[in-house]
Design a protein with these regions (language model features):
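ATPase nucleotide-binding head domains, primarily ABC-like/P-loop NTPase cores
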Residues: 28-31, 218, 286-287, 291, ...
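Amphipathic heptad-repeat alpha-helical coiled-coil/stalk segments that mediate oligomerization
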Residues: 193-200, 256, 267-269, 360-435, ...
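Charged catalytic and DNA/RNA-contacting regions of genome-maintenance
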Residues: 1-317, 326, 330-333, 337-346, ...
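Extended, charged coiled-coil "arm/hinge" scaffolds of SMC/Rad50-like chromosome-maintenance ATPases
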Residues: 402, 485, 489-523
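Conserved phosphate-binding elements of NTP-dependent enzyme cores
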Residues: 2-6, 13, 522, 540, ...
């Protein structure tokens, strides 16, 4: 165990899989963890003694089965292998850790998800400037970014990092600012030192400056990047030639969405177990590379009109040529995951079978180029020009590799015949030797008259002759008996031993030579990493565009018109997710919507509960997003002035773990919107103020609507509310207009028409919804009586004066006592123009306190 303890001391934070013969063993606390996670038996060696040791293990060939379970459970797993043949040493077998696999650093297919990246992240900050870096070692993508806390938090959430590197001194600050993550590894301060980080990065890329990557060396993201490269060293990942560049995430190139928006719009994940996210509906990609790229496009919609026009026009070209669509889909579907295969090539973790798949996939590139060779396909021809047929790589693989190459190189027949003369000679010797064994068998059968005689092999005796007991009296005297079984005897002969030496010697030499030739092949392929990665990039792009075309045809989407105006006009728009879930005989009811900065800046949307207000908000955002990732959209027509930020405050939720109520979460999200508005923002607000009392809620909703209306950037806003009193704002604010989701009211029921029409609604029909939910009749009658009483005595709408704005600001209160008169004077004296949103909320809280006292 001394060897084990010595190795374990080097990896105290990892679960150590210690190779012992044909098993991986775990000991002590590692054994307890492994037993619990994997469901394997926990045993004890030396039970009851001072040297009692807990252990649990599994066969070495089951590594891939168990490894992903350990990593998914958040464990860092150190794999300790035998570094020499036990047969060739008389002392303890030399062992060492050959790989440290962590949740964020993995190349194993069992751990990785085909359609998702597996990002390792690192975060570091200098005062208020935060840097972040992301690496997916399985694809070679290395990214950096810098910005304020909120920006980096959004990136960390959107990129779904599986593991995060953090400076030890920032441990508590990181948790306070970013929350809890399941897998975090802490480094000492010196790992984030600027000189150390820059040296690490420059050494990896073999450059003296980072200007070639367009990155300023003062970028805080580089410090995070340096720690990632250091972590790869620490985890025994030395071969990294597939990481050929750093890409900078530039905020100004993409639509800004905070983490609330990505979650509220359910872009990647649904908020319910049975629900569907947007990506579930729009993903018509045919390859893993395309699926991963589509996810990236969705969290980073474009602002560049030129790039968007290229995508839309490419989709249009494919739609107009359906034969091309079906042919491209067929070719793309047959591609292997080139990004991850080339990563395995570089790290020498590739199997012979996967190299055959690489050859077949590269062969498909020629077919795809041919399909895109028509120069009338102006946009798609650009992709044709960007693809490389890789003829020299295909030729090398064709000459070297057997078409029937196995998964495991140890099974042999990896290298093609006639590629290496020495290998051909050894194979001939091995085959002829086996033929000779068959001749020996036939000869001895004839000589002895034992027709059931057979020649077999095992690792103990090598080749032997087996004779059943009923024939053992016929055995020649020169045969040497080696083993007695219940029903048979086993013998060897000098002739058998001579040929055994030749055959086994040849087979061992074949194994060694094939391994060397296979490594030589991989070494050659490493030189072509960049060209294969470039093909992978463009094939993934093409896959997304073909997927968009397929989506547009199947779901009847149309090409949007994008421009740099301030207008947003959607004709007969539909919600892509809801529409896809409806039965065929229940078509989605489309809606028209128009926003602009001159007359229709804010639409105040009222209507009954369950009428579809929230769906209209989300559908508008999703149509904009689809347009700005290059997809067609679910609408008859869509004219969209480029949106640079999308904000949502949709749905009720709390954050109990952080001690935040539903209302506090609502205010946090609203504050994020107010503090980050830009020139071309789209703001979606749903039921602002419902987390508190009616008067507080109306006051806050009113104040936020007014703030957005008067903001110099005039953000386009959809404001869904159940406070019908807010309809009064349209009379005093020139760019606020009322619309409602209409209903048809009958004697005993309400029919939801789901149609957006001009004008405000005065009823929520909440009692009707309760009735639909199956509430008892007596309860419903009681509720109706109470509603009538409340409407008579607490008609807030009647309190709101429409005469002038100053009265409107005070009409929430019935000012008929001295305390309220004093409060009135205090409010009138306020300079509204100088109040920040936060100060307004503080003042509101103070008013609430006075009214309660």
């Amino acid at each position: 165990m001394r060897q084990y303890y010595k190795i374990k001391d080097k990896y105290p934070d990892a679960l150590l899989l210690f190779r012992v013969g044909d098993f991986y063993e775990t000991f002590h606390d590692d054994a307890v963890k492994a037993s619990s996670i994997l469901g394997i038996i926990l045993t004890k060696r030396g039970a009851g003694s001072n040297s009692e040791t807990k252990l649990a293990g599994f066969p070495h060939h089951s590594l891939n089965t168990y490894l992903h379970k350990l990593v998914k459970a958040g464990e860092r797993v150190a794999i300790c292998e035998q570094l020499e043949d036990p047969k060739k040493t008389k002392s303890i077998v030399k062992r060492g850790v050959t790989e440290l696999i962590t949740p964020g650093v993995a190349l194993n297919d069992g751990i990785l998800e085909q359609k998702s990246n597996n990002f390792l992240a690192s975060v570091f900050n200098i005062k208020n400037q935060y840097g972040v870096s992301f690496l997916d070692i399985s694809t070679g993508e290395l990214l950096i970014a810098e910005g304020n806390l909120e920006y980096v938090k959004n990136l960390l959430s959107n990129y779904d990092a599986k593991e995060i590197l953090v400076c030890k001194k920032n441990k508590s600050a990181f948790t306070n600012e970013f929350g809890n993550y399941s897998s975090i590894f802490y480094f000492d301060d010196w790992v984030f030192n600027k000189d150390f980080a820059l040296e690490k990065i420059k050494n990896h890329f073999d450059v003296s400056t980072l200007k070639g990557f367009g990155i300023n060396e003062s970028n805080v993201g580089l410090l995070a990047c340096g720690s990632i490269l250091h972590y790869l060293d620490e985890t025994q990942h030395k071969k990294l030639e597939h990481i050929i560049k750093i890409n900078q995430i530039i905020d100004s190139s993409h639509v800004w969405m905070d983490q609330f928006t990505v979650a509220n719009l359910e872009l990647i994940y649904s908020n319910s177990k049975e629900g569907k996210s947007l990506i579930d509906i729009i993903d018509y990609t045919s390859s893993p590379m395309g699926a991963r790229m589509l996810k990236r496009w969705l969290i980073h919609p474009l602002l560049d009109l030129k790039k968007l026009n290229f995508r839309h026009s490419s989709v249009d070209e494919i739609i107009k040529n359906k034969d091309l669509l079906f042919s491209l889909q067929s070719e793309l579907r047959s591609l292997s995951d080139l990004e991850r295969i080339i990563a395995k090539v570089v790290t020498f973790k590739i199997s012979p079978r996967e190299l055959v798949q690489l050859k077949e996939s590269l062969t498909k590139v020629k077919s795809i180029k041919d399909l895109l060779s028509d120069k009338s396909l102006i946009n798609l021809y650009k992709i044709n020009s960007s693809l490389d047929c890789c003829e020299s790589i295909i030729k090398l693989l064709e000459q070297t590799l057997s078409n029937e190459a196995p998964v495991n190189i140890k099974k042999g027949n990896v290298i093609k015949e006639n590629f290496n003369s020495e290998l051909d000679e050894l194979r001939s010797l091995s085959i002829s030797g086996k033929d000779y064994l068959n001749k020996i068998l036939e000869r001895e059968k004839n000589n002895t008259g034992i027709t059931s005689l057979k020649i077999s092999f095992n690792n103990v005796f090598g080749y032997f002759i087996e004779v059943r007991n009923i024939h053992k009296d016929k055995v020649p005297e020169d045969w040497i008996r080696k083993q007695t079984l219940v029903n048979a005897e086993r013998y060897i002969t000098s002739e058998l031993k001579d040929y055994e030496a030749k055959i086994l010697g040849a087979e061992e030499k074949i194994s060694v030579l094939e391994s060397k030739l296979f490594e030589d092949l991989i070494t050659e392929l490493v030189k072509d990493v960049e060209v294969i990665q470039n093909n992978s990039f463009w094939l993934a792009n093409l896959d997304c565009l073909v997927g968009f075309a397929n989506l547009a045809l199947k779901a009847k989407y149309t090409k949007p018109i994008l421009n740099n105006s301030k207008d947003l006009e959607i004709t007969k728009g539909r919600h892509p997710v809801i529409e896809s879930q409806l039965p065929q005989d229940s078509p989605y009811i489309p809606n028209d919507l128009k926003l602009c900065d001159k007359t229709n800046q804010i639409l105040m949307i009222t209507g009954p509960n369950m009428s579809g207000k929230s769906a209209i908000l989300r559908q508008t955002a999703l149509i904009v997003l689809l347009a700005q990732i290059g997809s067609f959209v679910p609408a008859e027509k869509a004219k969209i002035g480029i949106i640079d930020k999308i904000f949502t405050r949709v749905g009720a939720s709390d954050n109990i773990s952080a001690g935040e109520s539903t209302f506090m979460v609502e205010m946090n999200e609203s504050a994020s919107i107010i503090n980050n508005i830009s020139k071309n923002s789209l703001v979606l607000l749903d039921e602002i103020g419902r987390g508190t009392s009616t008067y507080d809620g109306i006051s806050i909703a009113w104040a936020i609507a007014e703030f957005l209306h008067d903001h110099p950037y005039k953000p386009k806003t959809l404001f869904a509310t159940h406070y019908h009193e807010l309809n009064m704002m349209a009379d005093s604010f020139e760019r606020i207009n009322n619309v409602n989701v209409s209903v048809k009211e009958t004697k005993n029921s309400v029919i939801f028409l789901r149609k957006l029409v001009p004008g405000g609604s005065a009823h929520s029909f909440g009692i009707h919804v309760a009735q639909m939910a199956g509430m008892p009749k007596g309860l419903i009658l009681s509720a109706k009586k109470m509603l009538k009483k409340l409407e008579k005595s607490h008609n807030v709408g009647n309190d709101i004066s429409r005469d002038n704005e100053s009265e409107m600001q005070l009409s929430f209160f019935n000012l008929d006592n001295p305390k309220l008169e004093e409060l009135k004077e205090d409010l009138i004296s306020l300079n509204i123009d100088e109040l920040t949103p936060i100060e307004a909320l503080i003042k509101l809280n103070e008013i609430k306190r006075i009214l309660k006292s």
